[in-house]
């Protein structure tokens, strides 16, 4: 298993782990690292995609081991201070490892700044903060995800999860029939960060809504 497999969620497990409902069912003193690393690997890493919060947790654990800092504190200092973004509380396991994929408190105005950083290929207000090639790699399809035409018909081109990059869903898969259009992050119950390079536009939404159809309808107004 390599860092690349953690980033594109192809670590080889048959199901995603570390979702909120899963965590609630585990004993409160569960060692999540032991739990993840001893869970069955059913596929060669890099060959099977499944959305999996465990991969992000492992990335946070590795970063904390290397830097000696809590992940939230490290990325705040190394990146977000330069942008005027303030990360709120970020939930951690009882071992002190940042959950990574969930539990972050963040204002919509700050999430919008992150979207602009992606749109501008790693620059913010004219200052280079991230490597342009890295941003390109993030939003390049690394793995195709489903029975694509049916999926598109169900949700519409503007918000389909046709492929996955590094930490980003990508609309389209880069083929002639389904060209890559925009890319996005999608959190539970309506947390969305959408980047459209073609339209030079970003959309960020923070909500708490089980029925996502009204939100999708509003997004289609801009993209369809």
Q: What are these language model-derived features?
A:
Residues 76, 80-140:
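Active-site-proximal binding-pocket segments
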Residues 1-85, 108-122:
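Active-site-adjacent helix/loop patches that line small-molecule binding or acyl-intermediate pockets
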Residues 85-87, 139-202:
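Active-site Gly/Thr loop motif
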Residues 2, 100, 107, 134, ...:
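Residues that flank catalytic or metal-binding motifs in active/ligand-binding sites
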Residues 44-51, 99-105, 185, 189:
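Solvent-exposed loop and edge beta-strand segments that line ligand/cofactor-binding
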Residues 213-224:
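Short, gly/Ser/Thr-rich active-site loops of penicillin-recognizing serine hydrolases
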Residues 209-211:
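A short acidic/small-residue loop/turn micro-motif
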Residues 2-8, 89-90, 116, 194, ...:
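Structural recognition of the beta-strand scaffold that forms the well-ordered cores
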């Amino acid at each position: 298993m390599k860092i690349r497999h953690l980033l594109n969620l192809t670590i080889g497990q048959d199901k995603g782990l570390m979702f909120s409902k899963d965590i609630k069912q585990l004993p409160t003193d569960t060692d999540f690292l032991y739990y993840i690393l001893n869970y069955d690997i059913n596929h060669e890493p890099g060959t099977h995609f499944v959305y999996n919060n465990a991969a992000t947790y492992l990335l946070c654990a590795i970063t904390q081991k290397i830097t000696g800092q809590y992940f939230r504190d490290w990325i705040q200092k190394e990146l977000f201070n330069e942008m005027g973004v303030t990360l709120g509380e970020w939930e951690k396991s009882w071992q002190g490892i940042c959950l990574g994929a969930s539990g972050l408190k963040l204002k919509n105005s700050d999430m919008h700044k992150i979207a602009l950083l992606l749109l501008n290929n790693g620059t913010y207000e004219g200052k280079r903060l991230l490597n342009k090639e890295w941003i390109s790699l993030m939003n390049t399809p690394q793995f195709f995800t489903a029975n694509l035409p049916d999926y598109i018909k169900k949700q519409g081109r503007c918000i389909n999860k046709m492929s996955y990059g590094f930490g980003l869903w990508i609309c389209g898969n880069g083929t002639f029939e389904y060209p890559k259009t925009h890319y996005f992050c999608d959190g539970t119950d309506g947390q969305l960060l959408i980047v459209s390079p073609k339209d030079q536009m970003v959309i960020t939404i923070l909500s708490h809504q089980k029925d996502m159809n009204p939100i999708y309808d509003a997004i289609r107004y801009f993209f369809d």
